């Protein structure tokens, strides 16, 4: 049965308008973005099938074009619709953590980093640069690829900090495996960066490791003193 044949108010768009987006399931929200389904499969059924095929909404939205377009009835247009929705979400998070904002809310920082890094299929090592009042100067992706203690150079971190005139730094990187637990290599490079920054009187406030569902904070574990 097509969505247009559903009882009034039960279609995903109508439900959203009547009750708000928070009352929709993942499949219903995705159906609103997709707009239509296939012959014999309405938009909600198509959306549910897409989510099931990838094991969840996050995995679907972080999948490559070739992976998504392998699904029956899903072509470049629907892939573009999905990516537009993802990018809008990232830009909203970026606006929420804009230049000049004082970082007084750890949850805001976590939400921003989760949106920026959790769906990457490769490792990204980044810096959140802050001024003397812990206002945001810039978020900078410094390295990409396989990151270990040998591939991250503290002198490049120091160089960027000096260039941007930062007074404090939050280091962050993601684990494409989805598991946020820091490795021994993560702890070693954190210590090296902290020591390098200390030579220019800049504080390392935290190192946050981003997984699929959580972020581990070195500061909260007492690993940065």
Curated annotation (Swiss-Prot):
Q: Which GO terms describe its biological process?
A: proteolysis
State the Pfam families in the record: RadC (PF04002), UPF0758_N (PF20582)
Q: Which keywords label this protein?
A: Hydrolase, Metal-binding, Metalloprotease, Protease, Zinc
Residues binding Zn(2+), per UniProt: 173, 175, 186
Q: Where is the MPN domain?
A: 102-224
Q: Does the keyword Zinc apply?
A: yes
Q: Where is this motif: JAMM motif?
A: 173-186
**Entry keyword annotation includes Nucleus:** no
User: Which GO molecular function annotation, any one, does this entry have?
Assistant: metal ion binding
Family per record = Belongs to the UPF0758 family.
- PANTHER family per record: DNA REPAIR PROTEIN RADC, UPF0758 PROTEIN YEES-RELATED
Task: Tell me what this protein is called.
Answer: UPF0758 protein Sfri_3828
């Amino acid at each position: 049965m097509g969505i247009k044949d559903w009882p009034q108010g039960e279609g995903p768009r109508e439900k959203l308008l009547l009750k708000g987006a928070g009352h929709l399931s993942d499949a219903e929200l995705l159906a609103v973005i997709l707009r239509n389904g296939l012959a014999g499969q309405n938009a909600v059924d198509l959306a549910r099938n897409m989510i099931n095929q990838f094991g969840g909404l996050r995995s679907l939205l972080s999948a490559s074009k070739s992976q998504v377009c392998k699904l029956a009835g899903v072509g470049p247009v629907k892939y573009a619709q999905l990516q537009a929705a993802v990018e809008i979400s990232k830009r909203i998070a970026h606006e929420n953590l804009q230049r000049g904002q004082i970082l007084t809310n750890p949850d805001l920082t976590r939400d921003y980093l989760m949106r920026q890094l959790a769906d990457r299929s490769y490792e990204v090592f980044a810096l959140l640069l802050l001024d003397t009042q812990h206002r945001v100067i810039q978020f900078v992706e410094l390295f990409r690829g396989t990151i270990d203690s040998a591939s991250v150079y503290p002198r490049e971190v120091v160089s960027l900090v000096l260039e941007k005139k930062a007074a404090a730094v939050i280091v962050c990187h993601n684990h494409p495996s989805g598991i946020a637990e820091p490795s021994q290599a993560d702890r070693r490079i954190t210590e090296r960066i902290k020591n390098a920054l200390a030579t220019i009187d800049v504080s390392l406030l935290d190192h946050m490791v981003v997984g699929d569902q959580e972020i581990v904070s070195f500061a909260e574990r007492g690993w940065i003193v």
